[in-house]
């Protein structure tokens, strides 16, 4: 202890770690979600949104959910059974489309209910099934740490899962 300060070694909580900083632009950052793990993609997109960027996520039906197919289906079906005894409108909203499911995952990683900055960040988000014409010409990015590492047979595509729980294209 020198001069009233505690000297701590640089560790996990220090600010010396390398973090990717993306500069705010007028054009949206387009993320191609093909073969990305859902949670890792959502956390990376949430960070970009909180930095003040506009983000568009394309190909939401090709996002991968980790875990066995049967477990993913079972968890989604159990979630669909949650509702209110008195009135079904009082229960949670059950999204079945891949783009709205992904938008909800990202929203849950933002301070949506606690801070106005979270709501503003969520308004800068756009999610799409496929790739719309106006976005096809823009450069698309991918997050290396969010890509799947094993073969695709170890994951379930979000589009496939949504078709099973009731999404009709």
Enumerate the language-model features and the residues they cover.
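Ribosome-associated RNA-binding proteins
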Residues: 2-169
């Amino acid at each position: 202890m020198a001069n009233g300060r505690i000297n701590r070694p640089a560790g996990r909580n220090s600010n010396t770690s390398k973090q990717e900083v993306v500069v705010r632009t007028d054009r949206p950052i387009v993320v191609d979600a093909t073969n990305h793990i859902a949670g890792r993609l959502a956390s990376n997109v949430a960070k970009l949104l909180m930095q003040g960027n506009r983000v568009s996520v394309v190909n939401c039906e090709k996002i991968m959910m980790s875990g066995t197919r049967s477990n993913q289906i079972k968890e989604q079906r159990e979630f669909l059974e949650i509702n209110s005894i008195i009135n079904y409108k009082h229960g949670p909203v059950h999204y079945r489309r891949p783009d709205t499911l992904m938008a909800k995952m990202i929203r849950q990683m933002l301070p949506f209910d606690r801070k106005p900055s979270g709501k503003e960040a969520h308004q800068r988000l756009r999610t799409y099934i496929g790739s719309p014409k106006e976005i096809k010409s823009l450069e698309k990015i991918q997050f290396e740490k969010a890509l799947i590492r094993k073969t695709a047979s170890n994951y379930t595509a979000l589009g496939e899962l949504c078709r099973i729980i009731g999404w009709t294209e």
